A protein has these predicted regions:
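Extreme N-terminal leader/targeting segments of oxidoreductases
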Residues: 2-79
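Glycine-rich active-site loop/strand segments that organize a redox cofactor
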Residues: 123-159
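N-terminal Rossmann-like FAD-binding beta1-loop-alpha1 element of flavoenzymes
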Residues: 80-104
Length: 314
């Protein structure tokens, strides 16, 4: 990891975290500046409201919680606060460990997020060795069509451009734990579906425990292995930390966050904050307000994502 500077991590950690999902990143996009949002649907709210709006809808559903200083039972300080111990959060924690960055991973649940036994990476060496190649232009267009043009194409580009490097990084870690990480050469024939022409890119990477994998690691999921990795370096996930709000300075820069814990409110002060909390698919009110098309025609009802990260970052 010598070629990755501390600054490059803090400005682009989501690029590494992106390998954790097949084609997307956990977490929410940062609030955009007025220049970036010129001509878009996001715009400033009426003067004095302190809210960003999407159309006529406040991005923050309700007022920001007001927590008195006297209600804070503990204050922590760190260089990097990672909010959420799911796919993106744990990948970021491992990279921060490698770079020697002081960090806190705050997770509201009692365990790291679940993972599958595969992920997607674009044009990795193993793909070329199998005589295949991902058509990135076609894949980019397929993803945009699949999401009705509403996905963040900047995130897709990060995955298209950088997932191969991240795959090499993840593969080394998994291999050291006794896992065989292999490209599925039977996938990605370039077409699929019934009665339609659907592009299926060769991107699937599987990982399974080798015969020589130590028993204590053989049944662990990727994020559990990542947790063990950071534990061995003296770090741990802070569980039972439910995000209440982000804290900011007078200029509006994020300075950390306040969490609700069983002991009371805890303020984590951080020079840098990385939001890896997931989306809001399990919050019907927010879905109706911000993404009514998805709410009207849901593809899945199994999500457990509620909006603390998106809510707080709005």
């Amino acid at each position: 990891m010598e070629d990755i500077s501390r600054r490059s991590f803090l400005t682009g950690a989501v690029a590494v975290a992106g390998i954790a999902a097949t084609a997307g990143l956990a977490g929410c996009a940062p609030q955009q500046t007025s220049e970036a949002t010129a001509g878009s649907s996001a715009q400033a709210a009426p003067a004095g409201s302190g809210k960003t709006t999407i159309g006529q809808t406040p991005a923050w559903l309700g007022d920001a919680p007001q927590i008195e200083e006297s209600d804070i039972v503990n204050t922590m300080e760190t260089e990097l606060l990672i909010v959420g111990a799911g796919n993106a959060g744990m990948a970021a924690a491992v990279l921060a460990t490698d770079l020697g960055i002081d960090f806190v991973v705050a997770e509201k649940a009692g365990a790291v997020g679940a993972t599958r036994n595969w992920y997607g990476a674009v044009n990795i060496p193993e793909c070329a060795e199998a005589g295949k190649e991902v058509d990135t232009v076609k894949l980019n267009n397929v993803l945009r069509q699949a999401f009705g043009g509403k996905n963040d194409m900047r995130v897709v580009k990060v995955w298209l451009d950088e997932s191969a490097d991240t795959h090499a990084w993840v593969k080394q870690i998994m291999s050291d734990y006794g896992y065989e990480v292999s490209f599925d050469s039977d996938q990605g024939l370039g077409h699929g579906g019934v009665g339609i022409d659907m592009y299926v890119p060769p991107i699937q990477v599987n990982y399974n425990a080798r015969e020589d994998c130590p028993e204590e690691y053989a049944k662990l999921k990727r994020n559990e292995l990542f947790e063990d990795y950071i534990n061995k370096q003296g770090h741990e996930v802070t569980y039972g930390f439910d995000l209440v709000k982000l804290t900011t300075d007078d200029a509006g820069a994020v300075t950390g966050a306040i969490f609700d814990t069983k002991e009371g409110y805890v303020h984590v002060k951080a020079r840098n904050t990385l939001m890896t909390t997931g989306g809001y698919a399990a919050n019907a009110e927010m879905l109706d307000s911000l993404n009514p098309m998805s709410s009207a025609k849901p593809a899945s009802q199994t999500s457990r994502y509620t909006p603390p990260g998106c809510d707080a970052a709005a």
